[in-house]
């Protein structure tokens, strides 16, 4: 089973992705629906915010790809905002709740890493950046 979305980096796209992933998880009776929806929501928000900071003059896209095998759900979100610098990735993945402050930034990945089994980052060609997560699911 597979879901592929290509959206512009806008608030409207965040709302569309939220509705789509909610429908997907409900229709296919995927366990941990709320967690999955939250993870996708946070990944898409990060991509939208990163691309809006780039202030592109031409239309760019965010790709949301969800695949479900028998026991694994895989989600990737790809944007064109050049990604998270290599040296900051380990800080993101090693942060913990004791270090959490009340700023508006940086909390999404902290929650995501506790809701999934695997998270990774990939620099792709032409300033494209991918964040992927995997979650084991049992029905």
Regions found by a protein language model. Give the residues of each.
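Glycine-rich/acidic phosphate-handling loop/turn and adjacent ATP-lid/helix
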Residues: 77-103
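Glycine-rich nucleotide-binding loop
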Residues: 83, 125-133, 137-139
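Glycine-rich phosphate-binding loop
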Residues: 101-116
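Glycine-rich ATP-binding loops of the HATPase_c
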Residues: 117-125
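Short, highly conserved beta-strand within the GHKL-type HATPase_c fold
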Residues: 65, 71-76
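A conserved short beta-strand within the histidine kinase catalytic ATPase domain
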Residues: 57-66
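Conserved ATP-binding N-box helix of the HATPase_c
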Residues: 31-58
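Bergerat-fold GHKL ATPase/HATPase_c domain
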Residues: 1-38
């Amino acid at each position: 089973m597979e879901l592929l979305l290509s959206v512009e980096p806008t608030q409207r796209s965040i709302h569309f992705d939220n509705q789509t992933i909610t429908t997907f998880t409900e229709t296919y009776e995927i366990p941990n629906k709320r967690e999955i929806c939250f993870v996708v929501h946070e990944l898409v928000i990060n991509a939208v915010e990163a691309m809006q900071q780039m202030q592109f003059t031409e239309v760019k896209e965010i790709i949301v790809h969800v695949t479900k095998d028998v026991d694994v759900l895989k989600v990737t979100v790809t944007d064109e905002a050049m990604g998270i610098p290599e040296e900051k990735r380990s800080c993101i993945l090693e942060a913990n709740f004791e270090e959490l402050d009340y700023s508006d930034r940086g909390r999404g990945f902290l929650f995501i890493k506790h809701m999934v089994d695997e998270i990774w980052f990939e620099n792709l060609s032409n300033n494209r950046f991918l964040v992927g997560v995997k979650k084991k699911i049992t029905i």
